[in-house]
Amino acid sequence: ISSSKMKKAKKILSDTEPYFYNWMTVSDVGKYYEDFFEDFSMEKYRQMISRMELTEDMKAKKLSSGMMAKLKIAVTMAREARLYLLDEPLNGIDLLARDQIMKSILEAIDPDVTLVVSSHLVDELERVADAAIFMKDGILANQCMVEELRINQHKSVVDLYREIYGHGGEEVC
């Protein structure tokens, strides 16, 4: 997206903390978001929770961390936007749930939508990312197109991560 389009684009941020009341069911969460956000699609929400194997009668307070992450992604991706910002959506989630969440996100977004994911799980995102941006001490440390990095520099995003943040590109174990 060009910078002028980005200024006009509708942006959605998914925070690391859930904002659901303990009494809510998965269905209640959808209704709550539908009442507060006119860009929220209940149809898309139901598709997302189905993809993520959540049922509408599940209680929010009883969800595991992986299921809670799925619910947060479902409400975020059920909103219409040109730019989605996901803050650590895979943090603390087991491997199978991470795979399911990433698959659901990729199936849910339109090709003309921009998805920005902040994460320390670089290896998980490398296989689906077009570009990588690295911040260090609040400053842009590096940015690259993932495929160009592989072809031109014969490096992975993980290699570049290690160079920027330590270990000189060497694996520790």
Where do the protein language model's features map onto the residues?
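Helical segment within the ABC ATPase nucleotide-binding domain
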Residues: R98-P111
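Catalytic Walker B motif of ABC-type/P-loop ATPase nucleotide-binding domains
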Residues: Y84-E88, I93
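A short, surface-exposed alpha-helical micro-motif characterized by mixed small hydrophobic
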Residues: L125-R127
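ABC ATPase "signature
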Residues: Q143-C144
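H-loop/switch region of ABC-family ATPase nucleotide-binding domains
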Residues: S118-H120
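ABC-family P-loop ATPase nucleotide-binding domains
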Residues: D15-L71
